């Protein structure tokens, strides 16, 4: 591109890009004319051209490397232009006025010259460049006349032939081509344009009329006068479209406002705005403020999604229908696009000029109400070094009442930006827009129903609208009504529509076969196997007919449904529930038969993994069933328990088993080891670090986990190890199901199951709760458990505050494990070892004697099942590891583990007559500890 610029500069005619002066010739009285071309004399060290684009408002030589001086000053220095009148002459005409498309035309013309082997660029190459550019007005007009690049190239070669000489790197322009460039500038001036586009080059080419290009057009049957007419007509249409950006009228009274704004009142008259339901107090307050003499600028403040923009649209609809006071009757509500206003302002003062023009048009019109959505974007908009931003430019007009402006912004942005500038804040009158209630949201949805039914081509039931409002309020906590409810019905409509629009499975299979047949047919034709191609073509025709018949049948069925009164697909309550579930992961759909069976058999399933502890398993199962059928308190967590008891009896394991069974996997559980929160300063890790501290941007371990997965089990393991401040923070979680994190966001805990484990009271349980005297309770086991429970509860009251314990749903005391229960757990743990060895293709069997030995060594009522795991590790896993390393046991072996008469563990490779306990005889269950 650098080379193209240099050639263009050298070839530019004198009237365009050079300075001429008469210099007296030595030895004579006559003067001779000296012509200094722009780039031929421009040899400035350090001046390196890097780009050739963006000419409409920028220099053609986009980036001048290694030079800080202005490009035009370099040109003047190279041309030795004296000060005075001539020094004001610049070379803007060519380089600053060429559009990108015009530059592309010149570059393509040079490429065409190289292709033809010519060492010049003439009018014919410019014509080929105009056709080859493809997207400009000139290319479109020539294409509409039936002129294409291929035919034009043929005609050019016929007339001038191909060159055989050496083509220089820098290809000069012919005098006639220079004349075309000169005429294109004149054409641009006549049309009132301050740029040269491809259309002006074409007009210059036609006006020149005597070059090879004119003969080419004549040979191709094109009428120059007709081409000229078409170009001027298209230029006029483009100008009209540009003037009407933003939907304004074609009358050019307010060009700036129409370019950067959208007329909401006109859209309301055309019925293109959604109906606004309710919000009467806010609209009346806005009208009231607009009627003031000064500072008549309402600012709508509310949370995102509550309907601030809708209030401006509601005002436009009222004005369109005439239902407004005479103070604002006949006015236009125009929303300003700040992004469009700032876009393309490359030079200092350009943005301010646009804004001043805009304000002047509003001031002169006196019938404009300006609506600026996200009004906080005014602050800092357009500000550069030494410039002032949009807010400061607008301040005087806002205060004097010359400009009626409605702003809209969120509470956070209002606090961050507008409240920081008291001078701007006093010019806007705040109008609070509260979140609508569920009932108001239902009315809004009913008002919008028709628009969404037309868009999705279906119907919404009343129940679906009620469900959208209620479920979005209950389950989607981080957004606001009515926005989240509207999004629900919109996505549900899209889902139902797509489901009904699916092609039948039969038609899909036929289409797949049809594609394959077509592919094979084309390959057969390429391979000149015409007999096979003919057979495949017949099959292709048959398949097309079958597909058409299936599609026609589907259309007839839908037509018959509509005739019988069925108005297309319906969006029901279950569709809304499905969308809520897919958004949040919370199952809100109705309980299916399979799920009902799972819920009713929950205790039985959990007991496959948890041995004993009936009270805890029943309490957990009851809570899940209550939540799933929708009977739980909607403002509290699903349930909150504290599991207390000795170590190793299955407190944490029960939470893991629940997460694995009901929530899909153990990873679905949020586990917090409270031993990590023993110090006061670690409490902030739960909700996030305060501002100014490391980790503020990362969020809290608890709050972020629940925000991402709102339907889950939260396990606070070893709760008594935590600092007492943790319990204070948990009070609002247990009571109201909510917690505010360090960034001020409210996290919803209403769909979590909270489980806290504790070893408080383990010393009481170890003693067994025995007391002196007679016990009249016949069930000694239950009597002992009840005594232990009351003693543990008393000890919990000593450790935890009453307000904490009072908020828990249930305090469950785990029993000590009996020897029989430990034996069942041993079966589960041994099965784990069998499974691990099976992956290594080693079959393991243990005898009954070995199992008894493991239970004897691993049973300790005070420590639960954990000693059992250690006994298996020591007696079984260590023995197996030694034998495997000694290569006495290899893959594919069958191993029996037994205990001899002296009590030593023996590992036998191969079968023996000893009675064994095989893998198949083990219970199908999983470990407890």
From Swiss-Prot:
CDD domains, alphabetized: AAA, RecA-like_ClpB_Hsp104-like
Subcellular location: Plastid, Chloroplast stroma; Plastid, Chloroplast membrane
SMART domains tied to this protein: AAA, ClpB_D2-small
Boundaries of every UVR domain copy: 511-546
Gene Ontology CC terms, in alphabetical order: chloroplast; chloroplast envelope; chloroplast inner membrane; chloroplast stroma; chloroplast thylakoid membrane; mitochondrion; plant-type cell wall; plastid
Keywords: ATP-binding, Chaperone, Chloroplast, Membrane, Nucleotide-binding, Plastid, Protein transport, Repeat, Transit peptide, Transport
Reported tissue expression: Highly expressed in rosette leaves. Expressed in roots, stems and inflorescences. Expressed in photosynthetic green tissues with high levels in young, developing leaf tissues.
PROSITE patterns named in the record: CLP_R, CLPAB_1, CLPAB_2, UVR
Disruption phenotype: Small plants with chlorotic leaves, aberrant chloroplast biogenesis and inefficient chloroplast import of both photosynthetic and non-photosynthetic preproteins. Clpc1 and clpc2 double mutants are embryo lethal when homozygous.
Residue intervals of the Clp R domain: 95-237
Annotated segments matching region Repeat 2: 173-237
Gene Ontology biological process terms in this record: chloroplast organization; protein import into chloroplast stroma; protein targeting to chloroplast; regulation of chlorophyll biosynthetic process
UniProt feature, compositional bias: Basic and acidic residues: 553-562
Domain of life assignment: Eukaryota
Subunit structure: Homodimer. May form hexamer and interact with Clp core. Interacts (via N-terminus) with CLPS1. Interacts with CLPF.
Function noted in UniProt: Molecular chaperone that hydrolyzes ATP and is associated with the chloroplast protein import apparatus. May function as the motor for chloroplast protein translocation, as translocation requires ATP hydrolysis in the stroma. May interact with a ClpP-like protease involved in degradation of denatured proteins in the chloroplast. Involved in the regulation of chlorophyll b biosynthesis through the destabilization of chlorophyllide a oxygenase (CAO) protein in response to the accumulation of chlorophyll b. Involved in leaf iron homeostasis.
Protein name: Chaperone protein ClpC1, chloroplastic
Organism: Arabidopsis thaliana
Gene: CLPC1
């Amino acid at each position: 591109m650098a080379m193209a610029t240099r050639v263009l500069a050298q070839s530019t005619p004198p009237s365009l890009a050079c300075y001429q002066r008469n210099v007296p010739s030595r030895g004579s009285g006559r003067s001779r004319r000296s012509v200094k071309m722009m780039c031929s004399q421009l040899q400035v060290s350090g001046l390196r051209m890097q780009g050739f684009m963006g000419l409409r408002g920028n220099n053609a030589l986009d980036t001048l490397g290694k030079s800080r001086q202005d490009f035009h000053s370099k040109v003047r220095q190279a041309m030795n232009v004296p000060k005075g009148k001539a020094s004001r002459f610049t070379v803007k005409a060519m380089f600053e006025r060429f559009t990108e498309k015009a530059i592309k035309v010149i570059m393509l013309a040079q490429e065409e010259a190289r292709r033809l082997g010519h060492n010049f660029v003439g009018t014919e190459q410019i014509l080929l460049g105009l056709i080859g550019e493809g997207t400009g007005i000139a290319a479109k007009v020539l294409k509409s006349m039936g002129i294409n690049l291929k035919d034009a190239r043929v005609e050019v070669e016929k007339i001038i032939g191909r060159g055989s000489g050496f083509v220089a790197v820098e290809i000069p322009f012919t005098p006639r081509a220079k004349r075309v460039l000169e005429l294109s500038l004149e054409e641009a001036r006549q049309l009132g344009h301050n740029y040269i586009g491809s259309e002006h080059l074409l007009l210059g080419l036609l006006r020149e009329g005597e070059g090879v290009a004119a003969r080419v057009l004549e040979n191709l049957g094109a009428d120059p006068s007709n081409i000229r007419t078409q170009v001027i007509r298209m230029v006029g249409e483009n100008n009209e479209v540009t003037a009407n950006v933003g939907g304004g009228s074609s009358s050019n009274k307010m060009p700036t406002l129409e370019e950067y704004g959208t007329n909401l009142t006109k859209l309301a008259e055309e019925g293109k705005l959604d109906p606004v339901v309710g919000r009467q107090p806010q609209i009346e307050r806005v009208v009231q403020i607009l009627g003031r003499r000064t500072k008549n600028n309402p600012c709508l403040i509310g949370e995102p999604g509550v309907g601030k923009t809708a209030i401006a649209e509601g005002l436009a609809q009222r004005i369109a229908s005439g239902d407004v006071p005479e103070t604002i009757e006949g006015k236009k509500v125009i929303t300003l696009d700040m992004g469009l206003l700032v876009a393309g302002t490359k030079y200092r003062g350009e943005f301010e000029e646009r804004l001043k023009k805009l304000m002047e048009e509003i001031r002169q019109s006196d019938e404009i109400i300006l609506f600026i959505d996200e009004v906080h974007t005014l602050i800092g908009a357009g500000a550069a070094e030494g410039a002032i931003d949009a807010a400061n430019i607008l301040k005087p007009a806002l205060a004097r009442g010359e400009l009626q402006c409605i702003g809209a912004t969120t509470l956070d942005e209002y606090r961050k930006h507008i409240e920081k500038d008291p001078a701007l804040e006093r010019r806007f009158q705040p109008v609070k827009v509260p979140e609508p209630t569920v009932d108001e949201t239902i009315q809004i949805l009913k008002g919008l129903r028709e628009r969404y039914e037309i868009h999705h081509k279906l119907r919404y039931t009343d129940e679906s609208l009620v469900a959208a409002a209620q479920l979005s309020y209950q389950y989607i906590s981080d957004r606001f009504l009515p926005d989240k409810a509207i999004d629900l019905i919109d996505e549900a409509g899209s889902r139902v529509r797509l489901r009904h629009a699916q092609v039948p499975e039969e038609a899909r299979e036929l289409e797949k076969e049809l594609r394959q047949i077509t592919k094979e047919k084309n390959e057969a034709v390429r391979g000149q196997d015409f007999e096979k191609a003919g057979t495949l073509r017949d099959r292709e025709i048959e398949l097309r007919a079958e597909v058409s018949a299936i599609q026609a049948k589907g259309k007839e069925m839908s037509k018959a449904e509509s005739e019988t009164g069925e108005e297309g697909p319906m969006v029901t309550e279950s569709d809304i529930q499905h969308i809520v579930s897919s958004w949040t992961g919370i199952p809100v759909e109705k309980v299916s038969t399979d799920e009902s069976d799972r819920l009713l058999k929950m205790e039985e399933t959990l007991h496959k993994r948890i041995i004993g502890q009936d009270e805890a398993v029943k309490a957990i199962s009851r809570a899940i069933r209550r939540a799933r059928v929708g009977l739980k308190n909607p403002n509290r967590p699903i349930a909150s328990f504290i599991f207390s008891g000795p170590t190793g009896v299955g407190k944490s394991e029960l939470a893991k088993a629940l997460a694995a069974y009901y929530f899909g996997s153990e990873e679905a559980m949020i586990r917090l080891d409270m031993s990590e929160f023993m110090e006061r300063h670690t409490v902030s890790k739960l909700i996030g670090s305060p501002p100014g501290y490391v980790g503020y941007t990362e969020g809290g371990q608890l709050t972020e986990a629940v925000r991402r997965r709102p339907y889950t089990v939260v396990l606070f393991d070893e709760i008594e190890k935590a600092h007492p401040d943790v319990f204070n923070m948990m009070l609002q979680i247990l009571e109201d199901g909510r917690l505010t994190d360090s960034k001020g966001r409210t996290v919803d805990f209403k769909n979590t199951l909270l489980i806290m484990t504790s070893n408080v009271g383990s010393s009481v349980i170890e003693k067994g709760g025995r007391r002196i005297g007679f016990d009249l309770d016949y069930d000694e086991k239950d009597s002992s458990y009840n005594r232990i429970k009351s003693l543990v509860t008393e000890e919990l009251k000593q450790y935890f505050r009453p307000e904490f314990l009072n908020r828990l749903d249930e305090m469950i005391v785990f029993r000590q494990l009996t020897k029989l229960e430990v034996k069942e757990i041993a079966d589960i743990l041994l099965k784990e070892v069998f499974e691990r060895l099976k992956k290594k293709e080693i079959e393991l069997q243990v005898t009954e004697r070995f199992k008894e030995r493991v239970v004897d060594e691993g049973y300790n009522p005070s420590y639960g099942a954990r000693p059992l795991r250690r006994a298996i590790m020591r007696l079984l896993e260590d023995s197996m590891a030694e034998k495997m390393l000694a290569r006495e046991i290899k893959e594919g072996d069958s191993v029996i583990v037994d205990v001899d008469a002296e009590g030593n563990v023996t590992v036998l490779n191969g079968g023996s007559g000893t009675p064994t306990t095989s893998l198949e005889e083990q219970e199908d269950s999983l470990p407890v500890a």
